[in-house]
Regions:
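Short, highly charged C-terminal tails/helix-capping segments
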Residues: 158-162, 167-170, 182-198
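General structural signal for secondary-structure boundaries
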Residues: 86-91, 129, 152, 190-193, ...
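Hydrophobic-cavity lipid-handling domains and compact docking modules
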Residues: 2-128
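Intrinsically disordered, compositionally biased charged tails
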Residues: 1-15, 195-212
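Short intrinsically disordered coil segments
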Residues: 81-86, 134-138, 199-204
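Signal for well-folded cores of large energy- and translation-related assemblies
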Residues: 109, 141-152, 161-166, 170-178
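Short acidic, glycine/tyrosine-flanked loop/strand segments centered on an H-E-D-like triad
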Residues: 109-153, 201
Length: 212
């Protein structure tokens, strides 16, 4: 055995496997196992999976989920949702000739102070004019921005990922023009409140010191 091969094998022997779990608002399901030589290095790692892997619902295969490792205890890594998105193939499948695609992007703040960027998309049955597009975007904004502030981050994730926002927008916007699909096609977590994620050099959130 060459020295280089032995060195690589020794590096792998020094690594431990960490089980990565979805957050409670996605059932705390195990979504991955990752090797790492130091639990501190697990913090900040991002794991990609699909909503199908969480729900076992075949219709959810087109939704990608990204989980961010926030805390490690033993060999268990707990996460928060960093974001989600439609697969490129699914998004392409929604396009139809003679229809209009309407996009809007909103930065929203949850009740517990997470800031998320939500990218909303609507596909109409027929081509619409500029005024109709404006009205549909206004409905998107009203529902997303008003409701986001009343929800904790976990609830907000459910609304975005499971299509609940899309259903609410659809039911109002269809009065402007017939629609084929509405949904939050992508989300991205921008700001995480203090005390949620382990600080650099630590593996878990430390309890606050009690003042004398």
């Amino acid at each position: 055995m060459s020295k280089a091969t032995k060195k690589v094998r020794d590096k792998w022997r020094a690594k431990e496997w960490y089980d990565v779990y979805a957050p409670a608002y996605f059932g705390e399901k195990k979504v991955a196992s990752i090797p790492c030589s130091d639990p501190v290095k697990v913090i900040g790692r991002v794991v990609e999976t699909t909503l199908y892997d969480i729900t076992n619902d075949f219709s959810h295969q087109s939704q990608k989920l990204y989980f961010l490792a926030a805390n490690v205890k033993g060999t268990r890594a707990d996460t928060i949702l960093k974001g989600h998105e439609y697969s490129a193939d699914y998004l392409r499948s929604l396009v139809r000739r003679g229809s209009t695609r309407i996009d809007a992007i909103f930065n929203v703040t949850s009740k517990d102070q997470y800031v998320t960027r939500a990218s909303v998309v609507a596909f109409t049955r027929d081509r619409v004019n500029a005024n109709q597009e404006h009205l549909i975007r206004s409905i998107m904004r009203k529902i997303i921005e008003e409701k986001a502030g009343t929800l904790a981050y976990g609830q907000l994730c459910h609304e975005m990922v499971l299509g609940l926002f899309g259903s609410e927008i659809y039911n109002l916007a269809k009065k402007v023009s017939p629609l084929r699909h509405v949904g939050v096609r992508k989300s991205k977590l921008l700001i995480i409140p203090e005390g949620v994620m382990a600080k650099p050099g630590e593996t878990s959130v430390q309890p606050k010191a009690v003042e004398a």
